[in-house]
Amino acid sequence: MTILTFQNVKHILAASLLSLGLVACDKGTQFTEKTDDNTQTKSSIEQIKKNGVVRIGVFSDKPPFGYLDAQGKNQGFDVEIAKHVAKDLLGDENKVEFVLTEAANRVEYLKANKVDIIFANFTVTPERKEVVDFAKPYLKVALGVVSPKSHPITDVAQLKDKTLLVNKGTTADSFFTKTHPEIKLQKYEQNTETFDALKDGRGAALAHDNLLVLAWAKENPNYTVGITNLGEQDLIAPAVKKGDKELLDWLNQDLEKLAKEGVIHQAYEKTLKPVYGDTINPKDLLVE
């Protein structure tokens, strides 16, 4: 697999977003159906099997976790695990329909039945647990802040009265909105937009998951992650629609199986280790 960089992922995204991003609009998994004017609950897993495909929401512009490669194919750590989930559910890893999502759309896509499962670097928070059901976590993460080496940000206090770039609906957005109102936030939908804004000088720094900014800074040597571990360590997990206990229970069992089989570690070796090398101990990153 070719590791795609931030520099060219945005060009592939533009060409693929229309055809892939709206793919779920007419294939909603039905939880209820009308029969003789009586509403009967229908198994979500049964409906997925009837459809012959599981719809999984992933990122298109967040390498090495979820992105489109030069051929427009979905790649990344989240994608690797999602393929195994599809194989265990439907017997074939190709029976998955990847639906491109942005951070701010993840909850809405589940609510609107545009996806069955979200595998898009979804950080577990109390607020999100109120509106979706999270499965077992598979990654640990904190926040990081990246800035130009010429004007490095090494302490949050340096950001007072400055502009900080974040993505809408992310943990970074929530953290700085709640705890640092003195910092002006400039928000963007797509990761590529946010990093382009940093390069263009539209903000003093950019805050995102530390794993993402560390990977980006390795590709962009004029920038440094001056704050590598901000806030509490959080967990990243897949999610299903609120109340879909059947699919949630199945997913939890499958993730436990995949961890025991070493699949999650294999996904790390294939997608993350080529990026981070020895700078990150997998034990500090993976939940196995």
In which residue ranges do the predicted regions lie?
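C-terminal motif of bacterial Sec signal peptides marking the signal peptidase cleavage site
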Residues: G21-A24
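Extended ligand-binding regions for polar small-molecule ligands
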Residues: D26-K34, E80, H84, D88, ...
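Ligand-binding clefts/hinges and TM-proximal coupling segments of bilobed small-molecule sensing domains
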Residues: G28-T35, T39, K49, S174-Y188, ...
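Extracytoplasmic small-molecule ligand-binding "clamshell" domains
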Residues: E33-I118
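Short helix-initiation/N-cap motifs at beta->coil->alpha
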Residues: T41, V96-E108, H151, Q186-D196, ...
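Periplasmic-binding protein-like
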Residues: S60, L139-S147, N210, L214-L255, ...
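Acidic, polar ligand-binding/catalytic clefts
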Residues: K83, K95-Q158
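A ligand-binding cleft/hinge motif common to bilobed small-molecule-binding domains
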Residues: N105, F122-E130, F175-K178, T192, ...
